Structure formats: C-alpha cells, structure tokens
Amino acid sequence: MLRIEHLTKVYDDGTRALSDLSFEVTPGEFLVIIGLSGSGKSTLLRCINRLIDPTSGRIYFQGQDVTAAAGPELRAIRRKIGMIFQQFNLVRRALVLTNVLSGRLGYLPPAWAVVNYFPGEVRRQAIADLERVGIAQKAYARADALSGGQQQRVAIARALMQDPQLILADEPVASLDPATSHSVLRYIEELNKKDGITVVCSLHFLSLVRRYGTRIIALRAGQIVFDGRAGEVDEERFRAIYGEDAVEVEIR
C-alpha cells in the first residue's frame, strides 16, 4: 500500500531530519513510529502526504508516486489519506459539525466550499461519524468548548469523512492524560481492525505501542534503528532507540 524509498529531508537551515529511509507498509497494518523528540517522526508523516516536500527519495501510495504528484493528482491522493494531528488542528471558533464537514471538502466542487454548502447526505455522514466516536451530542457546540480528548475525537471524525484508506496520526495523544489517551487510541484501533484502514501512528510511550501497534519502526537521528514487532523491543533495544540513560515510563 505504502512504499518509502531512500527518503531524505534536509531543512533550509541544514538540519537533516530524515536520512535515506526505506520501508513498506502493507494493507491493514497498525504501524507505530517511535523515537526521541527530533528523531524525524513528524517529518516522516508530513512527507508522506506532502505537507512538506522531501529533499530526495520516493513515496508511493497504492502505486502512485506521491513525490511527483501535483495539482488534481495530488489532491486525489490526499483524499485517501486522513491526518490526525497532536494539536487537533480544528477551527476552534467553528462548530464541531463544521469542523467534521471540512473533511469532505476534497470531494465537493470548490464553489460549494466557498458558500459553506454541504448536501444533506454529507451532513448525515458527519453526524454518523460523530456518533461513532461518541460525541454526536456536541455537534452544535463550538470546538473550543470541548476538552482535549473530545477535540481529538472530532479530529478522528473529520478524518473519517474522507473515507480514508490510510490514516496518519502524528502523536495524537501527546497532550492527553493516560485514560483519555487509551480512549482515543481505541477509536483509532477500531478503524484499523473493523474497517481495515491502514494506520501509521507516531507515539512516545512503549506501553501504548505494545498495546496498539502491530509493528514498530524506531527512528534515531532520522534513521531507522529498529523495524519489527512490539514484543521484540527489549531493554537493550530500548536503550539503543532512546539512549543509555533513558527510563521506560508505563502508561496504564
């Protein structure tokens, strides 16, 4: 489904965020990207859907060269890839329903978006997606009136509006408490297991990784230092990923 070939990203200030990354993601996987802050996790996810452009290398999604795509072709690829951000990326002053409806904009004529017109079936889908994440009762509340966990569930519903085949989740629980973290990850896990949506998710805590991921890729200084199953990350590998002085923190 997703193939990364020799991906490198060097920022304008000379920072090398990714160095010659190559791997594949098969349909239905729940792949978790781990590593220290600054290891390249967010850069990798943002390169995959071209929020930022890689310096070199190739990204293929369902056989299409994402790195070469532009205009309508790139928009068509992005429609199939839902994105969930650490800071939710909601329009905070807008209604919850309006935020969720925005996930469907890629399928609608541009003129409809200008006048904020969404057909009845699209609105019904938005309410159904909010029901799925247990927050339909907040549809007509402003996004900034919601808790962090509720806002992240709105973001999941927005991603669902795209009918995605791949979801990229960039540290979706980094700003949430443990109980809320599990709640949000269970919704993402349900999309993976019940809907067959492939997930690539960056996380910090190995206890969460072991609970939800089917595969781990660990980054260190922009390079892959581990690619395997969660249960294979023993103390030696943990220290190779996070450093000799690192201590594993368990999230229950």
Predicted regions and their residues:
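Helix-to-loop junction immediately C-terminal to a conserved catalytic motif
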Residues: N49
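Helix N-cap at the start of a conserved alpha-helix in ABC-type nucleotide-binding domains
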Residues: P178-T180
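Conserved ABC ATPase signature
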Residues: R142-L146, Q150
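Conserved ABC transporter NBD signature motif
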Residues: G57-D65, I77
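Catalytic Walker B motif of ABC-type/P-loop ATPase nucleotide-binding domains
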Residues: I167-D170
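Conserved catalytic motifs of ABC-family nucleotide-binding domains
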Residues: D163
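Conserved ABC ATPase "signature" region
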Residues: Q64-D65, L108-Q137
